[in-house]
Structures are given as C-alpha cells and as structure tokens.
Design a protein with these regions (language model features):
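Flexible, glycine-rich phosphate/dinucleotide-binding loops
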Residues: 52, 102, 163, 206-208, ...
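Basic/aromatic-rich interaction segments and small domains that mediate binding to polyanionic partners
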Residues: 49-56
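Beta-sheet-dominated scaffold domains
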Residues: 83-86, 248, 254, 262, ...
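Disordered, low-complexity "stalk" and linker segments at domain junctions of extracellular
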Residues: 4-46, 58-252, 286
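Glycine-rich, histidine-containing beta strand-loop boundary motifs that form or position
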Residues: 2, 40, 95-97, 106, ...
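Beta-propeller fold recognition
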Residues: 96-97, 101-128, 255-257, 269, ...
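Beta-propeller domains
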Residues: 1-18, 258-287, 322-331
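Surface-exposed loop and turn segments in beta-propeller and other repeat-based domains
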Residues: 68-73, 224, 275-297
Length: 365
C-alpha cells in the first residue's frame, strides 16, 4: 500500500504489524530498517546511524502506534502516487517517478523492508597503488634507445565475472620487451569484494585486455593486448532534476528504464544479466548497456514498458515494438524500433492477461 510518504504491507488479507523496538541508545549503531523506541514512540531507521537521537527526520521515521501498523518512509507524496511506475522481481520492487531517482524496495523479512536509491555505479572500487617495474637481462646488449613506454591500468572483478570496476590510475615504464627474457611486472593493492583482476595495456590511445589473475601481480612478457575488450565505462544518466525515468520493466535479462523529462523518448537497458550495471566498452560489445532514442513524428513521453514476445513501449499517442534486426537477442547494434499502433496509453499501469496486453487508452481525461 502506497500513501502520502509511506508504504504499508499486507499479506493473506492481513495488515502487517511490528513489535516494539528496544529503547534507543546513543551507543548503538543502527542499520537501515532497525526499529528503536524513544519517548514511547517507535522509530524506523532511515539511515545507518549512531548517536542520532529521535526524532530526527534525516535518520528516523516515526511509526504508527495503537495499533502498531508496520510502515516505512516513502519518497512519494500523495499527489505523485498515480504517476509512480513499478515492476517486481522476486523480493525486489523497482519504483520510478519523473521527480525522483529510481528506487528499490527490498524485502528482508515480514517486517524488514528497505527502500533505497539504485546505485548504477560499479559495486567495486578501482584498484589503487598500481605500479610497474621492468626487467631486461643484464647480458642483453640492447641500447636504451630502443626502449618504449608501456602503460597499464587494472580493474577489479566480482566473482560473477560480470561486475567490473572502473579502471585504475595508469602506471608506465620504459623497456624493450621484444628482447628474450625481458618483462614488465604490474602490481596493485587488493580490492575488497574482488575475486579477480583484469590488466589492460595501452596502444594507439586505447587500453586493450592483457590478462586476468586472482593475485595482485601480472607479468607482461610481450603479450599482445586484445582491443576487442577494453576497460568498462560506467555512466549514470539518472542524475539531477529532469533526468529521472518514469517507466521501468525487465526484458531479456536486462532491467529497462525510459521516459525522463529531459529525454522523454529515450530508453536505457542495463548490461545483460545485471540489474543496475550501466557500463559499456569501446568498441561496444553485445552484452553492454543499451541506450537509444525513439525517432517519431511526435515527441511523447514513454509511459510504460511491457515485456511480451517483443518489448512494447506505450506513449500517450502510440505503441512501439522493440525487436532485434535478426532473430537473436537485442544488442546495442541490433536494436530495432517499429510502430505497432497509434492509440496511446494513459498513466494506469498496464496488465498482461495470458499473452495479451490490456491497457487504458489515452483520452485526455
């Protein structure tokens, strides 16, 4: 249930209630979602905090009493509720509104719900302390005039092998690694949460993939970099007033957003197999995030995104079908958009019945 700046929860025809929290203590560090009692009022922790005495609206949300109805803070006012769009995936509800950054409402227990803005950046920090040392056999008669600069960057990778950090600061060294036995050794500091590291080498103004390791050292003994794979570039287009999406859904293992005030006919898809990874490389790869604009005669905000056999986008004046130019999955280079009809939809959330879409037509009311 969504109301004026609150969420309430119901299951099997019953409203959820909470138990009184322990007395608030200035020596306790509270996690988001914790309940503490102060001056006979129970408070829901909106942030991770300590020594922040309730009532403090930045950190605490007062809960109803008599009865103890469980509710949490919502960023949406009563006037905004009919324009909130949402999609559910298991215990995660994604909510969007053009006035607010995209949010996730997550269920951790019957009375443990948390709403937070979505972080579209990398979950890993970029490696630090990157350095490179050179070695060339002392018996080599090669002149230092033949030495060239070799520049490297490193990224951290999670155990899913998909989430990758931004590239580190670069480190370089001069050497002639074409000589037998010559090598460059790249080292860096470990990153919390990383299971592997990828090293990239510069050539022609771009960094190409050199190698991958589970340690914090890699040796380059004249390895040819692969420029089909480059360090990821993370972008978050949903920052600032006018840049928040008003529509959301899922399609082909991507979370899909659309319809900001500043780009009403743009659509964004996360990196394949991820929920919030908006990274891409140069050159573009098939699993990179997708961003495109629907070119149409009339500029109408995308109000709804509906996944069927094809992805459907509903605006106030038309319906659009998003497909691939071939029979494969949608990729950044294969995406195709065609008009389906010219009816238009209003703001009411569409409903899928079997394999059909039911939506309320836009009638100007």
């Amino acid at each position: 249930e969504m109301g004026d700046y609150y969420f309430r929860f119901h299951t099997q025809g019953q409203t959820l209630f909470y138990n009184d929290g322990a007395a608030w203590s200035n020596s306790t560090t509270y996690a988001i979602g914790d309940i503490a009692k102060h001056n006979n009022v129970n408070y829901y922790a909106r942030t991770i905090n300590s020594n922040q005495q309730p009532p403090n609206a930045t950190h605490w949300y007062p809960l109803p009493t008599n009865p103890n109805i469980y509710e949490i803070y919502s960023p949406y006012s009563e006037a905004e509720l009919f324009d909130v769009n949402y999609v559910q995936s298991a215990d995660v509800l994604t909510t969007v509104h053009p006035n607010h950054a995209p949010n996730e409402l997550r269920r951790y227990g019957a009375t443990k719900w948390i709403i937070q803005s979505i972080d579209f950046g990398s979950p890993l920090a970029a490696p630090t302390g990157v350095s490179v040392s050179m070695y060339i056999p002392s018996s080599t008669s090669t002149s230092t005039d033949t030495y060239v600069d070799h520049e490297y960057v490193v990224t951290a990778v999670k155990d899913n092998l998909v989430d990758e950090s931004n590239q580190s600061s670069s480190a370089s060294v001069s050497n002639n690694i074409f000589v037998t036995g010559a090598k460059n050794t790249i080292t860096w500091n470990a990153v919390s949460g990383a299971s592997r590291y990828r090293v990239y080498k510069a050539q022609g103004g771009i960094f190409g993939f050199l190698g991958e390791t589970t340690t914090t050292t890699l040796v380059d003994d004249n390895i040819a970099p692969d420029f089909a794979k480059t360090p990821p570039i993370h972008e978050n287009d949903f920052v600032g007033t006018g840049n928040y999406p008003g529509a959301v859904s899922y399609f082909e293992q991507r979370r899909v957003f659309a319809g900001t005030n500043n780009a009403p006919q743009n659509i964004w898809m996360t990196k394949s197999g991820t929920e919030s990874n908006m990274s891409f490389g140069i050159p573009i790869r098939d699993d990179d995030r997708i961003e495109f604009r629907v070119a149409a005669r009339e500029a109408n905000t995308i109000r709804h995104i509906v996944p069927l056999t094809n992805l459907l986008m509903l605006t106030g004046s038309a319906e659009w079908r998003v497909t691939s130019v071939n029979s494969d999955a949608i990729t950044p280079t294969s995406i195709s958009v065609k008009p389906q009809s010219y009816v238009g939809a209003n703001n009411a959330q569409p409903v899928i019945v079997n394999n059909s879409l039911v939506y309320a037509a836009a009638r100007g009311g």
